[in-house]
């Protein structure tokens, strides 16, 4: 499993991401630029900065999709250890509980098991990034005015996946030999959301001590 995860983070060939960028599009070129910077060994704080002359919404869109794919993968590798029995509530330790709310089935905040919450979350995000009105892919079609607010909600909920995985399934990360890869993904995610102020500081509190240790 560790080898599989290592290969995935290296070349994205051992799994099928839920969303790809179309070759030949501006966003595909931005994605390639971002990936090249990651592989070059540059400091992650530098990697997340908006390249000169690029549109900030395009840059955010590329990263939201990439983080969705990677975090979906991280959770997927340990999903069998996150069950209705082991994780009856979506939580981040004893102090933090996350309830699910959407515009369809759960109009009021609902207490759900972690696997149920994760399934709804990934489907919800996939629906948004495949919605042309939210994440337009055609040249010349502008992003909606509330695009960054939508991305804030997506990234806030994805951060909660990190919270749950680190606090409740860190032993699984260690047993798979995946700690370095998950930490790198987290640091990349953290520097990005801080660079563009996309997640409220209060949401980051559950992992504050760990973040201070690995994101120094």
From Swiss-Prot:
Keywords: Metal-binding, Zinc. It comes from the Eukaryota. GO terms for cellular component: cytoplasm; nucleus. The keyword Metal-binding applies. One of its GO terms (molecular function) is metal ion binding. Pfam families: Mob1_phocein. GO terms for biological process: signal transduction. Zn(2+) binds at residues 82, 87, 164, 169. Coiled coil: none annotated. May regulate the activity of kinases. Belongs to the MOB1/phocein family. This is MOB kinase activator 3C. It comes from Homo sapiens (Human).
């Amino acid at each position: 499993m560790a080898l599989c995860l290592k290969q995935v983070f290296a070349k994205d060939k051992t799994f099928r991401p839920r969303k790809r960028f179309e070759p030949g599009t501006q966003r595909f070129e931005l994605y390639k630029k971002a990936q090249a910077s990651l592989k070059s060994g540059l400091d992650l704080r530098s990697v997340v900065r908006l390249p000169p002359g690029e549109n900030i919404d395009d840059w955010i869109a590329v990263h939201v999709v990439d983080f969705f794919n990677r975090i979906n993968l991280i959770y997927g590798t340990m999903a069998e250890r996150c069950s209705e029995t082991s994780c009856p509530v979506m939580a981040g330790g004893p102090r933090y509980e996350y309830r699910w709310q959407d515009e369809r089935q759960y109009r009021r905040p609902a207490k759900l098991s972690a696997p149920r919450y994760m399934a709804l979350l990934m489907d919800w995000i996939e629906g948004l990034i495949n919605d042309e009105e939210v994440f337009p892919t055609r040249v010349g079609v502008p992003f909606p005015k509330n695009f960054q607010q939508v991305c804030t909600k997506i990234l806030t909920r994805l951060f909660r996946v990190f919270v749950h995985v680190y606090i409740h399934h860190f032993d699984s990360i260690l047993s798979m030999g995946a700690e370095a890869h998950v930490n790198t993904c987290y640091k990349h995610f953290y520097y990005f959301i801080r660079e563009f102020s996309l997640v409220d500081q209060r949401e980051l509190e559950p992992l504050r001590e760990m973040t201070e240790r690995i994101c120094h």
